[in-house]
Amino acid sequence: MNPYVRAIITSGLILGPIITMSSNHWITAWCGLEMNSLTMIPLIANKYQPRAIEASTKYFLTQAMASYLMLSAALMNMWYYGQWDMQLLTDNISCTTMTVAMSIKLAAAPFHFWFPEVLQGATVLTALLLTTWQKLAPLTILVQCSQNLDTTLLIALGMTSILIGGWGGLNQTQIRKIMAFSSIAHLGWMYAILTLSPKILLLTFYLYVAMTATTFLMINVLQTNNMSAIMISWTKTPFMNTMMLLNLMSLAGLPPLTGFAPKWLILQEFTKQRLSMFASMMITSSLLSLYFYLRMSYYTIITLPPTTCNYPLQWRLMTNIHTALATITPLATALMPLLPTLKAIP
């Protein structure tokens, strides 16, 4: 890619969410979202392959439809109440339309149809951006409108996302599609807690970003795109495969790893609000996600491919030092003891 084009795309990726997060007007927030979406399209189509072009087209169409619904909700609210303020979204139809629009942008079930295919057509690093950075601006809009949104609708969308995210990842062999359904399942937990405690939602999102970024960076280093390739990655970097196992267990939410902390806080908040039945249903639905995380862990560290060599470790060149990966891996696996401190942050 041309360096000037890359600089423009990088600037758009950074400025788009910042404009949306710092704005209090619907038009300004919409401009930030559009800037963010339009700069992602050339990144997805950068491979110049039919699958990448198809993925970029799907991404453009779904984001355009979501932007149309967002503007429609803002215009309806302005028509009835004369307000462009994001925190004064008081019309019920506008609130529902805005929730649907942001759900399409975030790929929450049942509006997730585009997300696995787009991730499969993109590169690993582009998929990392789609599952982390691109979710920041829509989530910020939902947090700003959280006082006026329908709690029942959000809990229903959250439980549907947890269930479909776990169900869809069961029979997948492509790692990027598995991570797509994993993202949908984690988004369900964020939706469920959105109106009850936005502070816990933001903490959940930050920890989700750390765990997902670690997984994608490891996949990029190991050059593994499917289950059969992940089995032979142990012979290249044994230590990184061990960390991959811990990170997958953290994504599954097993104690005492980092991923258990946000789920614990969400279930605790549901219990305080006397929503124990919904909490039980969320825990039961998350068992589906646990299964495919355990399957990936089994392929990562426990199995070896058939080989005729007595010594399975392959000869290899010295690998590069990955500073970013070394920095965020402890955050993705070992933050559970710091949970009281994280919860106390205002």
From Swiss-Prot:
- The name under which this protein is listed is NADH-ubiquinone oxidoreductase chain 2
Gene Ontology MF term list: NADH dehydrogenase (ubiquinone) activity
* Catalysed reaction, written as an equation: a ubiquinone + NADH + 5 H(+)(in) = a ubiquinol + NAD(+) + 4 H(+)(out)
What's its job?
Core subunit of the mitochondrial membrane respiratory chain NADH dehydrogenase (Complex I) that is believed to belong to the minimal assembly required for catalysis. Complex I functions in the transfer of electrons from NADH to the respiratory chain. The immediate electron acceptor for the enzyme is believed to be ubiquinone.
Q: What organism is listed for this UniProt entry?
A: Pelomedusa subrufa
What's its top-level EC category? Answer: translocase
Q: How does it sit in the membrane?
A: Multi-pass membrane protein
NAD as a keyword of this entry, yes or no, is yes
Which compartments is it annotated to reside in?
Answer: Mitochondrion inner membrane
Q: Does this UniProt record's set of keywords contain NAD? A: yes
Task: Name the major location.
Answer: mitochondrion
Q: What is the lineage of its organism?
A: Eukaryota, Metazoa, Chordata, Craniata, Vertebrata
Q: Where are the transmembrane segments?
A: 7-27, 59-79, 93-115, 151-171, 178-198, 200-220, 242-262, 275-294, 325-345
Q: Which family does it belong to?
A: Belongs to the complex I subunit 2 family.
GO CC list: mitochondrial inner membrane
Q: What is its EC number?
A: 7.1.1.2
Q: Which GO terms describe its biological process?
A: mitochondrial electron transport, NADH to ubiquinone
Spell out the Pfam families in the cross-references. NADH_dehy_S2_C, Proton_antipo_M
Keywords of the record, alphabetical order, are: Electron transport, Membrane, Mitochondrion, Mitochondrion inner membrane, NAD, Respiratory chain, Translocase, Transmembrane, Transmembrane helix, Transport, Ubiquinone
